Amino acid sequence: MVAVLTWALALLSAFATAQTQKGFWDYFSQSSGDKSKVARVQQQKLTWETTSLKDSLEQDLSNMDKFLEKLGPLSGQGREPPGLAHDPEGMRQQLQDELAEVRARLEPYMAEAHQQVGWNLEGLRRQLKPYTVELMEQVARRVQELQEQLRVVGEGTKAQLLGGVDEARGLLQELQTRVVQHTGRVRELFHPYAQRLVTGIGRHVQELHRSVAPHAAASSARLSRCVQTLSRKLTLKAEALHARIQQNLDQLREELSAFAGAGAGGAEEGANPDPQMLSQEVRQRLQAFRHDTFLQIADFTRAIDQETEEVQLQLAPPPPGHSAFAPEFLQADSSEARSKLQARLEDLWEDINDSLHDGGLSHLEEP
């Protein structure tokens, strides 16, 4: 059954490649197992309206779905389907042979399109990398500044902490004020970097749209949707990253303020705060903020990689022989695989319809 599903996916990819390969209809005519039917379909395409062509293709897809149902669940289990040939092994071998021929003919075209789209998406990742690198550098720089501005170890501060209750309480209250002041300042400083990241995503994704259009197997409408979806997803993730950095700063402010407040309360009760302990606590909280924020930026970078890889599969699927060829179909359960296959078939129709409107019907008129 996996062979049948793979055969269907190979034909699906073949139609997607047809938008950029003018000779596809000739190939389909030569390699189809039912040449007389293809000849009739080609003759009808010369006179049918596009809506009639869609009805015909949808009927063919419906027939294929019924054929898949007759063969049983994708797991390969189930009773022998009625009404089919008495030689299922022969049928399976025939499908495998046809699939091998499809692979051999389509591999170069699909591999080239997949590679070209991949290069353009890799270019997008390279263009966005400076934004995340700059953000990490800013985090490190601001942490260093906060560490200097919130220092409580020095000859003057040490004497203050050990000089008496009023002196110690005054120093710790001043520390609370500095925590609020400087974390608020850092909070504001991150806004321009977040805005530059969002703006950069929008600009570079639009550049990607223009550069990938000549190589994508998808229709222009589907290409636009994919690019817009990518831009929206990355923008939302960038905004979420900025919100998490702000939350990290708020948490840092609250923790340091609470710690300084607790120290001031202890000083009122006669306990002399340890300057070294205070300094170490501030440093540990700042390093925790730096570590957590770096992890969140790294997660955002991985999300860029994942989203662009998904777009590459949508716009230019790898050839059938590629290890990444439809793994979600082969690993999914029956209902999920059928749902994903149906979505692929709907994308297929849109690509074919777009190609025909752009002059694809003229291919059928060639002798």
From Swiss-Prot:
<dbReference type="GO" id="GO:0034361">
    <property type="term" value="C:very-low-density lipoprotein particle"/>
</dbReference>
<dbReference type="InterPro" id="IPR050163">
    <property type="entry name" value="Apolipoprotein_A1/A4/E"/>
</dbReference>
<dbReference type="GO" id="GO:0005543">
    <property type="term" value="F:phospholipid binding"/>
</dbReference>
<dbReference type="GO" id="GO:0042627">
    <property type="term" value="C:chylomicron"/>
</dbReference>
<comment type="subunit">
    <text>Interacts with GPIHBP1. Interacts with SORL1; this interaction leads to APOA5 internalization and sorting either to lysosomes and degradation, or to the trans-Golgi network.</text>
</comment>
<keyword id="KW-0333">Golgi apparatus</keyword>
<feature type="signal peptide">
    <location>
        <begin position="1"/>
        <end position="20"/>
    </location>
</feature>
<dbReference type="GO" id="GO:0008203">
    <property type="term" value="P:cholesterol metabolic process"/>
</dbReference>
<dbReference type="GO" id="GO:0120020">
    <property type="term" value="F:cholesterol transfer activity"/>
</dbReference>
<keyword id="KW-0813">Transport</keyword>
<dbReference type="GO" id="GO:1903561">
    <property type="term" value="C:extracellular vesicle"/>
</dbReference>
<feature type="modified residue" description="Phosphoserine">
    <location>
        <position position="56"/>
    </location>
</feature>
<dbReference type="Pfam" id="PF01442">
    <property type="entry name" value="Apolipoprotein"/>
</dbReference>
<dbReference type="GO" id="GO:0005770">
    <property type="term" value="C:late endosome"/>
</dbReference>
<dbReference type="GO" id="GO:0034364">
    <property type="term" value="C:high-density lipoprotein particle"/>
</dbReference>
<comment type="similarity">
    <text>Belongs to the apolipoprotein A1/A4/E family.</text>
</comment>
<dbReference type="GO" id="GO:0055090">
    <property type="term" value="P:acylglycerol homeostasis"/>
</dbReference>
<dbReference type="GO" id="GO:0060228">
    <property type="term" value="F:phosphatidylcholine-sterol O-acyltransferase activator activity"/>
</dbReference>
<keyword id="KW-0445">Lipid transport</keyword>
<keyword id="KW-0597">Phosphoprotein</keyword>
<keyword id="KW-0964">Secreted</keyword>
<dbReference type="GO" id="GO:0005794">
    <property type="term" value="C:Golgi apparatus"/>
</dbReference>
<keyword id="KW-0175">Coiled coil</keyword>
<dbReference type="InterPro" id="IPR000074">
    <property type="entry name" value="ApoA_E"/>
</dbReference>
<keyword id="KW-0162">Chylomicron</keyword>
<dbReference type="GO" id="GO:0005769">
    <property type="term" value="C:early endosome"/>
</dbReference>
<keyword id="KW-0850">VLDL</keyword>
<comment type="function">
    <text>Minor apolipoprotein mainly associated with HDL and to a lesser extent with VLDL. May also be associated with chylomicrons. Important determinant of plasma triglyceride (TG) levels by both being a potent stimulator of apo-CII lipoprotein lipase (LPL) TG hydrolysis and an inhibitor of the hepatic VLDL-TG production rate (without affecting the VLDL-apoB production rate). Activates poorly lecithin:cholesterol acyltransferase (LCAT) and does not enhance efflux of cholesterol from macrophages. Binds heparin.</text>
</comment>
<dbReference type="GO" id="GO:0033700">
    <property type="term" value="P:phospholipid efflux"/>
</dbReference>
<dbReference type="GO" id="GO:0033344">
    <property type="term" value="P:cholesterol efflux"/>
</dbReference>
<keyword id="KW-0967">Endosome</keyword>
<protein>
    <recommendedName>
        <fullName>Apolipoprotein A-V</fullName>
    </recommendedName>
</protein>
<dbReference type="GO" id="GO:0042157">
    <property type="term" value="P:lipoprotein metabolic process"/>
</dbReference>
<keyword id="KW-0345">HDL</keyword>
<keyword id="KW-0732">Signal</keyword>
